[in-house]
Amino acid sequence: MTLWINGDWVTGQGALRVKRNPVSGEVLWQGNDADAAQVGQACRAARAAFPRWARLSFGDRQVRVERFAGLLESNKAELTAIIARETGKPRWEAATEVTAMINKIAISIKAYHIRTGEQRSEMPDGAASLRHRPHGVLAVFGPYNFPGHLPNGHIVPALLAGNTIIFKPSELTPWSGEAVMRLWQQAGLPPGVLNLVQGGRETGQALSALEDLDGLLFTGSANTGYQLHRQLSGQPEKILALEMGGNNPLIIDEVADIDAAVHLTIQSAFVTAGQRCTCARRLLLKSGAQGDAFLARLVAVSQRLTPGKWDDEPQPFIGGLISDQAAQQVVTAWQQLEAMGGRPLLAPCLLQAGTSLLTPGIIEMTGVAGVPDEEVFGPLLRVWRYDNFDEAIRMANNTRFGLSCGLVSPAREKFDQLLLEARAGIVNWNKPLTGAASTAPFGGIGASGNHRPSAWYAADYCAWPMASLESDSLTLPATLNPGLDFSDEVVR
């Protein structure tokens, strides 16, 4: 039984789904998808649970959420292993994901009060108050690259605000989704407050098509995000928060420490096997001898990055991609870039056929026309050379996306210029593109989102504002507007 609906674990009535380790092929999880009827049941359960959950005090909801944080802590080793085995990422990285999930609780509580708490301003004849109210029933679509942390970034603030939820994990990480839901069950959530439906496209379409949804929170690809945006068009009553990908540029200016710059670039482009939405996809490198030296060093160090299994010792920097199909898509993208005229610097290589262990790829595209403005979700870095910083910024902005952008340079004035001209929601200076703070908003512009950033700003899309003018007594004003006569004289 792999679906959690109205507090009960039930068997899906849809197609059988089997999840295997992307490197070894070991069967990790199997269960049946939720069919459309079960998705409807989950929605009705969430709707029925909403009034009581929303009427609880914030403190009562906070107790359950903090109990979940404690369960994450006590089950950290087990959940780390589940995430690592299912995604293929190394154990060390899965552990950092669980730690981020734990830290998210306190951050979300603080964000709730600062972003969407209550405010009161005294007035001469009363007060003006601001409160926030939950939307109702929200659908949460989770991604596979961080199957615990990223859905958690929607679920926790939504629950704190008083919403009820239907959660659909990625069909590529059902085991992680189920494991997290079982911890929520132990935390004592009332039946129907949080529901789990497993499945792929058909389940997702049934969920997003529900008429009784009050909103949908999504993290994933731009293609799917656009489909959801079109599907919910003409329904302004539903909140839609989209966090999508990017074709992210990293600008390398003059650097004093080449190895430090190479380390930052590798962290930006290849961590999580390139499967982070903020990963650098485009390296913009200044022309000249120093740029040549940097590029040679980057290729040499990247060549020594050998992907490994989730439990290898010593631990590898990167593991496998989410599937062998995903790895093959990166290889295909590389081949297409080379056929367009790209100059190969480091070819990606599958270490073993039928697995997702893929070495990084680097290819120079300077002077090549018609390069697709698409996100290749894997360890593939394209390089362009530039002559001056104004050109670098123009190249950085030459994308329909706008998630992250970074600069490696000792010059503060160049970063200040980038801050003014960059079109990206995250702009870093001498820090990896993949570095983000939960105490800041996380999101982008253009094809990277719909102006509903998550992380610190997740509280904003989990509640709506209610403004009130209030007075505990009613008296006739001392001065009346012109034309109003409350005298006792009879008008004839």
Curated annotation (Swiss-Prot):
SUPFAM superfamilies cross-referenced by the UniProt entry: ALDH-like (SSF53720)
Keywords: Arginine metabolism, NAD, Oxidoreductase
Superkingdom field: Bacteria
Any GO MF annotation of the entry: succinylglutamate-semialdehyde dehydrogenase activity
Pathway(s) this gene product operates in, as recorded in its UniProt entry: Amino-acid degradation; L-arginine degradation via AST pathway; L-glutamate and succinate from L-arginine: step 4/5
CDD domains: ALDH_SGSD_AstD (cd07095)
Entry EC number(s): 1.2.1.71
Pfam families given in the database record: Aldedh
Family per similarity comment: Belongs to the aldehyde dehydrogenase family. AstD subfamily.
Function: Catalyzes the NAD-dependent reduction of succinylglutamate semialdehyde into succinylglutamate.
Stated name of the protein: N-succinylglutamate 5-semialdehyde dehydrogenase
Provenance organism: Escherichia coli O17:K52:H18 (strain UMN026 / ExPEC)
